[in-house]
């Protein structure tokens, strides 16, 4: 470094404003014996002693390209220099405002000022911007200015697109992407990522992404999907599989259907965490007419979707398992999934759960009257009162209500009436899973389990066997004048058998079952 350069640095460090500005300029440009180092140049030009001065702002505006100025958050300095009459600052500020959705009037003002200062490109940009439609405004203003005066048109269009994406401005995002593609920006990973993000934004806003070339859309999806972008893989998989993609024009996937390729992309998206893809995979592989039909794989995809919390998958899996159930464990697993779906508001799942519950004979008994009767029974026999409440909430027969173990039978979704050891006839004594059709029923089961759990030591001695319980219940009902129909369900062995075995239940509930699987 020359002696005069060392002296200039010393003056700058001693507080000379002019020296600071000159050192900063030389570092920004890498001239006059100084290496180019933007960070050091900024440090000199942004010294607190220079705050609010126009000279350092003009140096920044003239020395750095617009994209670098914006990346370094030098918008205020650019505005200060433009207001001071700096032609380069007026041009760059006008262009940057033109790249923003709400900056048209400011852009015309600053570009007009640059045009009056003698900048021919600014005059062309003003004329183009004044006549351009909003969708073409970005391209119109960039074309006469691109690749001149430190202006990289394609790069600026991409930066403006990112800003529009951050602000959720879909229309302006499309305009910026159109400009980037129109100015010859290569469809690299960065631009393809913005195109995919535009599709995602359109999907979130319930709109269709119009205005972009269909080839660019498809190429962007394929490029990003190949790089592991799950959103791109999900969209591409749906489109190639013939599933409607509302966020894209139909022309994008016209003549592009390929089930095997689409299923592969859907599987890639699902594996990356796009949970909705599992259900699409199930539908594709469950369709026997499809070239990728595979019932076993379809079931696997349905289970995956159910595990990820999708109500439709939980309902369909529960319905299929219940239809195939031949053991209590199968029924319990099926009811678990139906209960999960019903908890999310699935009406079909709720209907199927209700089909497993026997109706109480005296449905017209008022809740107030039932509550009063239960209180009377509770004073005489609290264990029986709990059993009666369970019976009415879950639709149990008299045998089931008097023999059920509320502690062992409690489940997160309802109640399991275990095998009745006091009855020899298999069809009457076999265990049965009964779902809670609402939160109130589940609360009754939990209260009963808590009561019997606390009093388990004395419950056996107090209640006796089934014969003793039945005798005590009958005598208490006679004394209190209660009707058994208000608490117990009346069902034949054949009806109970139909609720235990999947094939028989499926025939009994064929209408709601068909609706649940088709919905």
Named regions from a protein language model:
Residues 404-441:
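Conserved tyrosine-mediated DNA breakage-rejoining catalytic core shared by Y-recombinases
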Residues 14-16, 30-31, 51-54, 67, ...:
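Short helix-capping/linker turns of helical repeat alpha-solenoids
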């Amino acid at each position: 470094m020359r002696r005069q350069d060392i002296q200039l640095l010393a003056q700058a460090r001693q507080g000379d404003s002019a020296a600071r500005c000159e050192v900063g300029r030389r570092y920004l440009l890498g001239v006059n014996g100084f290496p180019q180092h933007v960070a050091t140049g900024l440090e000199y030009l942004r010294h607190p002693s220079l705050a609010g001065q126009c000279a350092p702002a003009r140096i920044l505006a003239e020395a750095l390209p617009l994209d670098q100025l914006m990346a370094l958050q030098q918008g205020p300095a650019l505005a200060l220099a433009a207001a001071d009459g700096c032609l380069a600052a007026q041009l760059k500020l006008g262009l940057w405002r033109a790249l923003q959705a709400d900056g048209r009037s400011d852009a015309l003002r600053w570009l007009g000022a640059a045009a009056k200062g003698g900048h021919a490109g600014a005059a062309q940009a003003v004329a183009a911007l004044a006549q351009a439609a909003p969708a073409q405004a970005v391209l119109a203003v960039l074309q006469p200015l691109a690749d001149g005066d430190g202006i990289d048109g394609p790069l600026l269009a991409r930066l403006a697109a990112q800003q529009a994406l951050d602000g959720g401005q879909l229309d302006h995002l499309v305009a910026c992407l159109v400009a980037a593609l129109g100015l010859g920006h290569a469809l690299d990973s960065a631009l393809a990522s913005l195109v995919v993000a535009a599709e995602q934004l359109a999907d979130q806003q319930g709109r269709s992404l119009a205005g972009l070339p269909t080839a660019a859309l498809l190429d962007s999806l394929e490029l990003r999907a190949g790089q592991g972008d799950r959103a791109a893989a999900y969209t591409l998989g749906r489109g190639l599989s013939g599933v409607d993609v509302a966020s894209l024009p139909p022309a994008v996937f016209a003549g592009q259907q390929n089930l095997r390729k689409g299923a592969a992309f859907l599987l890639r998206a699902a594996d990356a965490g796009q949970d909705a893809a599992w259900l699409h995979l199930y539908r594709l592989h469950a369709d026997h007419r499809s070239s990728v039909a595979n019932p076993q794989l379809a079931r696997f995809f349905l289970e995956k979707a159910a595990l990820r919390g999708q109500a439709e998958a939980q309902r369909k899996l529960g319905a299929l398992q219940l239809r195939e159930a031949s053991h209590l464990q199968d029924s319990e697993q099926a009811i678990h999934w139906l209960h999960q779906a019903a908890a999310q508001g699935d009406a079909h799942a709720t209907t199927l759960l209700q089909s497993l519950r026997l109706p109480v004979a005296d449905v017209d008994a008022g809740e107030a009257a039932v509550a009063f009767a239960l209180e009377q029974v509770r004073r005489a026999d609290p264990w029986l009162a709990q059993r009666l409440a369970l019976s009415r909430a879950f639709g149990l027969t008299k045998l089931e209500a008097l023999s059920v173990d509320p502690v062992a039978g409690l489940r997160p979704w309802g109640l399991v009436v275990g095998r009745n050891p006091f009855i020899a006839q298999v069809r009457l004594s076999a265990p049965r899973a009964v779902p809670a059709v609402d939160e109130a029923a589940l609360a009754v089961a939990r209260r009963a389990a808590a009561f019997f759990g606390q009093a388990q030591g004395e419950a056996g001695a107090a209640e006796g066997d089934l014969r003793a319980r039945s005798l005590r219940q009958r005598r208490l009902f006679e004394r209190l004048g209660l009707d058994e129909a208000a608490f117990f369900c009346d069902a034949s062995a054949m009806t109970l058998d139909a609720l235990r075995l999947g094939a028989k239940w499926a025939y009994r509930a064929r209408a709601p079952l068909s609706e649940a699987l088709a919905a």
